[in-house]
Amino acid sequence: MDEVRQFLPPFIADEAVFDGWTPTARDAAAAAQGVEAGLATPAFDKGPMDMIDAWIGHIDAQMIEAFPPERIAAMKIRERIRALVAFRFEAVAHQREALRRATAIMALPANLARTARISWRTADLMWRLAGDTATDYNHYTKRMILSGVYGSTLMAFLDDESPDFADTHAFLERRIDNVMQF
């Protein structure tokens, strides 16, 4: 079951472009990848948020793999955060419509608590990869601020039609500049 939850999400995202985050998308992805429906259905039995959460978890895993300590060690903290946030957008650039549909589902009132947990998990992971070891109030404020930066930049990314997402990168840079003014 865990293997299916780790393997299938990017393929569900590919199908979500056409079918939304639905059982139809899940089943089409499973069929295309040779995964039995009897395994795919219970792996995502709590509906769209299960599929979306697993997809975001997959992106988290890609980010961990892409940023080993030796790659990130030479960067300044600001550069680390910028690179980590930018990576997440690059990882889903070909699935922006799936991301757009996912954000709509995540914004539903019934999903806000889980969305907040997912956002926190992602911000925490980025800070940990960046080398943050804070355990005092800074631990919490850094993650809350990064969640806001990431979320607002995500909205800019969804509407960005500039070459190589230059507008998104510029937006991210401005948000980081805003945070540095605190």
Model segments located where?
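Short, amphipathic alpha-helix enriched in basic
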Residues: 1-38, 46-53, 57
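Residue-level detector of well-ordered alpha-helical segments, enriched
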Residues: 8, 25, 51, 55, ...
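Short, basic alpha-helical nucleic acid-contact segments in DNA-binding proteins
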Residues: 58-65
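Hydrophobic alpha-helical connector segments
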Residues: 66-101
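Amphipathic alpha-helical segments used for helix-helix packing
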Residues: 91-113, 117
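Amphipathic alpha-helical packing segments from all-alpha helical-bundle domains
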Residues: 110-132, 141-147, 151
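Hydrophobic/aromatic-rich alpha-helical bundle segments in the mid-to-C-terminal region
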Residues: 132-182
